[in-house]
């Protein structure tokens, strides 16, 4: 559960993560991956632990627990501690159950070269595992929700909301090897009413029901009606739906990234510790401050008294103050004023800078970004979002002039748009 720490609520993520053997006894009998030469096998338990490790590392490196807490406050509102605990347990363990469907005997036989429980080979879902994992997840957590409601530990409204998340999270799991296309499409497939004929969710449910009944003599939790969930979402505010959309995308991204890193570790023997954060900020700032423009600005800051509004209004192309001339006086004044205002409002979340073209906004933005990285424990990366590719090119050229000789800095700068190839680090990095 979340806990109080120095006045802040924190997800205790590691205590929420379930060991795979608490969910299935088959984690060491079934395999998740084979090496390319098929001489090494990674058990499902080993892969799950790696995924959990990377999931936790990403959350910790990027301080995503603050997003968890904020979403829980804004979306879940005032709920009981038990409902909160179940929500957190469900959220954290998307990564734990995302590949549990690999116990599909046909996946084991065809993909892992492992003849395991071949008497339970499914006929209709082939060797697929993601949709089977989604059904496992649904059954596991719907049972927990129903039990808590039956015991009176959560109320009906809390049960309904938690079930919404169980379906959303199972959808995320079902799509972790593909894109996020359509939740309603997934829901229709679960109930066997998909108009396009893709009822793999229902087929996976039927196989899982047989598998669980044969092995454990236990029933599978019945799925809710499709329209019940959709109608409730339709009456939810747009604001809450935006929160939910962003939350769903975040958990999907976390799962895909953790799965990728974990799989790469097994396949390549490389344990990743680089999550794209800017860790050498002092080196970047030092290099930035050593360029001629910055030296001129800092010299002005040190030796010239700041201009008041009346003096600023009189600045023209012939104005010379110290070693700075014309419009560069205004650029310097804006640079220093924005830096001063930022430092005095460093805990604010949104800043707005408006100035005409040619006034030095790009250089000012560089400086403000670096100041934020330097002052904040939570800022780990800078995104510049531009309306036109020409502006991207201009600002990339500016950065190359400043950092072009420093490969350790330039290697961490990438352009992402429709005309620039993805940046790939070489093997030495």
Which residues are covered by each model-predicted region?
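N-terminal accessory nucleic-acid engagement/regulatory domains that precede
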Residues: 1-32, 53, 148-320
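Acidic/His-rich, divalent-metal-binding segments that scaffold phosphate/diphosphate chemistry
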Residues: 1-121
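An active-site-proximal "capping" alpha-helix that borders the catalytic cofactor pocket
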Residues: 46-59, 127-143
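Conserved Walker A/P-loop ATP-binding site and its immediately adjacent core
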Residues: 379-404, 415-420
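Inter-Walker segment of RecA-like/P-loop motor cores
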Residues: 405-429
């Amino acid at each position: 559960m979340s806990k109080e720490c120095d006045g802040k609520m924190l997800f205790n993520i590691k205590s929420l993560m379930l060991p795979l053997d608490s969910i299935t006894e088959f984690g060491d009998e079934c395999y998740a991956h084979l090496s390319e030469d098929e001489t090494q096998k990674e058990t499902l338990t080993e892969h799950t632990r790696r995924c959990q490790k990377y999931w936790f590392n990403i959350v910790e490196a990027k301080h995503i627990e603050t997003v968890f807490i904020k979403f829980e406050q804004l979306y879940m509102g005032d709920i009981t501690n038990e409902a909160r605990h179940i929500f957190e347990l469900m959220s954290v363990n998307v990564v734990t159950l995302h590949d549990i469907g690999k116990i599909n005997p046909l996946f084991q036989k065809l993909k892992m070269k492992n003849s395991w429980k071949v008497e339970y080979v499914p006929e209709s879902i082939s060797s697929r595992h993601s949709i089977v994992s989604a059904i496992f997840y649904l059954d596991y957590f719907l049972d927990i929700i129903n039990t808590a409601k039956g015991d009176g530990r959560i109320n009906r409204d809390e049960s309904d909301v938690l079930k919404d998340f169980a379906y959303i999270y199972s959808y995320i799991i079902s799509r972790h090897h593909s894109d996020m296309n359509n939740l309603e499409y997934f829901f229709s497939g679960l109930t066997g009413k998909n108009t396009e004929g893709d009822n793999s969710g229902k087929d996976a449910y039927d196989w899982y029901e047989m598998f669980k009944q044969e092995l454990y003599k236990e029933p599978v939790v019945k799925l809710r009606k499709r329209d019940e969930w959709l109608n409730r979402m339709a009456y939810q505010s747009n604001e809450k739906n935006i929160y939910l959309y962003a939350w769903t995308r975040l958990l999907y991204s976390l799962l895909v990234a953790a799965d990728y890193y974990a799989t790469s570790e097994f396949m390549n023997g490389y344990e990743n510790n680089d999550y794209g954060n800017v860790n050498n900020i002092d080196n970047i700032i030092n290099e930035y401050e050593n360029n001629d423009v910055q030296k001129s600005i800092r010299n002005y800051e040190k030796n010239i008294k700041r201009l008041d509004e009346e003096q600023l209004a009189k600045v023209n192309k012939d104005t010379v103050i110290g070693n700075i001339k014309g419009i560069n006086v205004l650029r310097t004044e804006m640079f220093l004023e924005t830096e001063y205002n930022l430092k005095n409002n460093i805990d604010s979340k949104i800043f707005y800078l408006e100035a005409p073209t040619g006034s030095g906004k790009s250089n000012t933005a560089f400086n403000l970004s670096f100041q934020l990285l330097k002052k904040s424990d939570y800022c780990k990366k800078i995104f510049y979002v531009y309306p036109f590719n020409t502006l991207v090119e201009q600002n990339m050229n500016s950065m190359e002039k400043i950092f072009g000789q420093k490969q350790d800095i330039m290697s961490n700068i990438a352009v992402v748009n429709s005309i620039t190839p993805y940046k790939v680090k070489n093997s030495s990095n």
